Amino acid sequence: MISFLLCLALLIIGYFVYGKIVDNTFGPDDRETPAVRINDGVDYVVMPQWKLFLVQLLNIAGLGPIFGALQGALWGPVVFLWITFGTIFAGGVHDYFSGMMSERNDGASIAEVTGRYLGPVMQNIMRVFSVVLLIMVGTVFAVGPAGLIVTLCKNGGMSGVMTTTLFWLIIILVYYFIATFISIDAIIGKIYPVFGICLIIMAVGVIFGIFTNPAYTIPEIWNNFTNMHPQGTPIWSFMFITVACGAISGFHATQSPLMARCMKSEKQGHFVFYGAMVSEGIIALIWAAAGCALYTITDGKMVGLAEALAAGQSAACLLYTSDA
């Protein structure tokens, strides 16, 4: 438990110390932002800072720091180190600069920003890469929630169309299109902050449950500084790519322009971009701790967690963890 608290403290300190160094390196000033200068009422709309933060958090997080962190916990508490230092020195820096570079270029997408600095060839490569990446991520972010809702409906005694994955996939995709084609403050600006708060409350509830239940103990890094994966899968590089979203993810660069177009001041960037990534790191740290604490460790291996993941994959494991 001490390991967890130390990593949590490092993430918070990292936001105020290293995050400020990153912010000062970029040098935000008082120039007009795209939201103020363009302000078309559709994509460029000034939003309050707290909304910017919560929307950015939900855009970059979602199920990523939950599913990925639970999978990463198979390697044991060493995953805490990757989440902590990856977030501070990699993920936070990446998200801040991708967001602020977009803001400095009229809220341009990552492909357009790449083209302005590296030329048309790299711009087209990044366009193709972004489309492929977004299709892959969009698929996961549709199928994952759909499967989770189906499991909840079945556990709640429902039947019929409400327990079919296809039905919920259609609902989610319809929502995707509606939210994409209308003004950003019509749905995203109103609903996303609520979901963002729910994501935070859920994480707080999980760690509160672990701290208040004597049956659960978060293993210490120094007592388990080894590969605890039941199948012996190497830490390098498998753990690092498994917990990508909870430490650093290039996908975030495709999301940051949304909030870069809604900032009133460049000085909000530290809180909105770096702060959202640190918050995601904290959420990932909590879920990784839950994966390490709630399941049986046999002969120094995370056997219980592996069995839970194999039985129901990440969505089912999320339910088991929440119930516990």
What positions do the PLM features span?
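Membrane-interface "cap" regions at the ends of multi-pass membrane proteins
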Residues: 10-66, 262
